[in-house]
Curated annotation (Swiss-Prot):
Its main location: cytoplasm. One of its GO terms (cellular component) is cytoplasm. InterPro entries: aa-tRNA-synth_I_CS, Arg-tRNA-ligase, Arg-tRNA-synth_N, Arg-tRNA-synth_N_sf, ArgRS_core, DALR_anticod-bd, Rossmann-like_a/b/a_fold, tRNAsynth_Ia_anticodon-bd. CDD domains: Anticodon_Ia_Arg, ArgRS_core. GO terms for molecular function: arginine-tRNA ligase activity; ATP binding. It comes from Acidithiobacillus ferrooxidans (strain ATCC 23270 / DSM 14882 / CIP 104768 / NCIMB 8455). It holds the Pfam family tRNA-synt_1d. HAMAP family: Arg_tRNA_synth. It is found in: Cytoplasm. Monomer. The gene is argS. Keywords: Aminoacyl-tRNA synthetase, ATP-binding, Cytoplasm, Ligase, Nucleotide-binding, Protein biosynthesis. SUPFAM superfamilies: Anticodon-binding domain of a subclass of class I aminoacyl-tRNA synthetases (SSF47323), Arginyl-tRNA synthetase (ArgRS), N-terminal 'additional' domain (SSF55190), Nucleotidylyl transferase (SSF52374). It comes from the Bacteria. This is Arginine--tRNA ligase.
Length: 579
């Protein structure tokens, strides 16, 4: 309907321009929805935009525009308000047309082709495979998967990717932690487990599986084991242990390293699949090393004159590209930094021909954005094609009690535990109830409630109520409406028009949610649509004896159910027909 009114407004402006009464037509015509229906269904400020160029009062220009509007079966009347706003009041027929459209387009209602021809790469979650996913990772997973669905619904070609940090120091710390638990099982660990090792029970499980696989084959590395408690610096202590294990185990260090990586990565994959989060590719950081991509990226920066050596380390001159300080690419021991791998990874993303790249990182990585963009500019790439969405933390509550967590200590609620307690639907929905850059309080007790307080239950219940009406119709021997040909002109009540008006908004919300990268707009819309439906359901007798009226009202209800199902699908939430 907005497109129809915009077209009519465009026609009026073209007529005035042809008559020489306005010098030109604005490039974009904004049509807003007034907050109060008394001010119309749509409003335009075009007369105010033209006032300066025309040299006349906006209200007088608005009078000319209204007079030039073509006759329409959908526009009931117009009203000039305030300094020169044009308010449009629509006929019921316009809203009936929306109901027909929903019933015709079905699961495609709300989709558009705004992103046609654009190929986007999205990277999200990408948690280090050093332990199970926890509830904090769940927010990034739900946000990323929902945004991918929304962008696809807007016609974008989306490629989702998980970057596996399998080549860094944290993986070595995990390997060392597994080895210490491997020794501990035989009481062969001479001192307490170090504080900066990975301490979760899952490490013991990995160590037990490793023992089943290799037996005592790795025990020999316990000889000459450095005495970690005697070292005052925990980082130096753990690095000394890692160096000892690499030297003592030789090729078997790869077996130890893989024991943790393979088991945890398999668990992460399974967890995300179970959460409805799917990737086109799992991209290994180690593959960047193996293929020489990191060497090539660093060499390109050196060749362009953007690097220098200081105290044996190779530095990238990031300050020349608006970062707050220069960054190390290669340490004095010859090892590349995580930043060097990240530069290579992003250069490789652009080499694959994506028109746009979206990274979703934890909010604690905000300082990382300038350095990555600086490296892209230094490589001659357009850093504006990289968009970084920072996802704030999710804080877990059980009622009013906050649940504290420590990842390294192994004291955390896993994503799998959350899903098992509240269900996938509640988890997916609650995670996207706020903008990504806002802190999220996740109340476990609320997520399990079967009441109006729980938004996902409230929305799903609206969908189920529609199908309950259909079952009741069959039980009462009442005919159901045909797929098409239902006369909707009989729907004239204000609540029916309001409900159809809410349906009309869905395609707009889909478009703005994609533009703003905000899945929560879909969640908010669905809650409003469900509220409008529940109000209608509770105040209106839908299964009346009169067949034409019953068919029309059921058709309206089915259109509501379809819109709810479409919106929930974008958020990865089911739309049950019975609850």
């Amino acid at each position: 309907m907005k497109a129809f009114v915009s077209q009519a407004l465009q026609g009026a402006l073209q007529q005035l321009h042809a008559q020489g009464r306005i010098p030109g037509i604005p490039a974009t015509l904004e049509l807003d929805r007034p907050k109060q229906v008394e001010h119309g269904h749509l409003a335009s400020n075009v007369a105010l935009l033209l006032a300066k160029a025309v040299g006349r009062k906006p209200r007088d220009i608005a009078d000319d525009i209204v007079a030039a509007l073509p006759a329409s079966d959908w526009i009931a009347r117009t009203e000039i308000a305030g300094p020169g706003f044009i308010n449009f009041f629509l006929q019921p027929a316009a809203f009936h047309a929306v109901i027909h459209r929903v019933r015709t387009e079905k699961e495609h209602f709300g989709a558009n082709r705004n992103g046609a021809g654009q190929r986007l790469q999205m990277e999200f979650v990408s948690a280090n495979p050093t332990g199970p996913l926890h509830v904090g990772h769940g927010r990034g997973a739900a946000y990323g998967a929902s945004l991918a669905n929304i962008l696809r619904f807007n016609g974008f070609d989306i490629f989702c990717e998980y970057y596996v940090n399998d080549a860094g120091r944290q993986m070595d710390i995990l390997a060392a932690s597994v080895y210490l638990r491997y020794l501990e099982a035989d009481k062969a660990l001479p001192w307490p487990f170090p504080e900066n090792g990975y301490r979760g029970d899952y490490v013991r499980e990995i160590a037990a599986h490793l023992r089943e696989q290799v037996g005592d084959r790795l025990r020999h590395a316990a000889v000459g084991l450095p005495n970690l408690p005697q070292m005052s610096d925990g980082d130096i202590a753990i690095d000394t242990l890692i160096a000892h294990l690499k030297q003592s185990l030789g090729e078997d260090y790869r077996t130890l390293h893989s024991a943790g990586l393979d088991e945890i990565l398999a668990d992460i994959r399974d967890d995300l699949e179970g959460f409805g989060v799917h990737y086109e590719r799992w991209y290994s950081e180690g593959s960047l090393m193996d293929t020489g991509a990191v060497d090539s990226a660093v060499a390109a920066l050196e060749k362009a004159g953007h690097c220098y050596t200081q105290e044996g380390a190779l530095w990238f001159r990031a300050t020349a590209f608006d970062d707050d300080k220069d960054r190390v690419l290669r340490r004095d021991n010859g090892a590349y930094t995580y930043f060097a791998s990240d530069v290579a990874y992003h250069a490789e993303k652009f080499a694959r021909g994506f028109t746009h790249v979206i990274d979703m990182w934890g909010a604690d990585h905000h300082g990382y954005v300038p350095r990555v963009k600086a490296a892209l500019r230094a490589l001659g790439l357009d850093d504006q094609q990289l968009e970084v969405v920072l996802v704030q933390f999710a804080i877990l509550y059980r009622g009013t009690e906050k649940i504290s967590m420590s990842t390294r200590a192994g004291e955390f609620v896993t994503l799998r535990e959350l899903r098992e307690e509240v269900g996938n639907d509640a988890a997916r929905f609650f995670y996207v109830l706020r903008r990504a850059d806002q802190h999220l309080d996740f109340d476990l007790e609320l997520a399990k409630k079967h009441s109006e307080e729980n938004p996902v239950f409230y929305i799903q219940y609206a969908h189920a109520r529609v199908y309950s009406l259909l079952r009741q119709s069959v039980e009462k021997g009442l005919s159901l409406p045909p797929a098409d040909g239902v006369g909707l002109e009989i729907l004239q009540e204000s609540r029916e028009i309001a409900l159809a008006d809410a349906l009309w908004r869905f395609p707009e919300v889909v478009a703005t949610a994609a533009r703003d990268r905000e899945p929560h707009q879909i969640a908010f819309y669905l809650r409003e649509l469900a509220a409008a439906f529940h109000t209608y359901y509770n105040s209106t007798r839908i299964l009346v004896e009169e067949t034409p009226l019953r068919h029309a009202r059921l058709t309206l209800c089915l259109a509501v159910a379809q819109s709810i199902a479409n919106g929930l699908r974008l958020l990865g939430v089911s739309a049950p027909e019975q609850m």
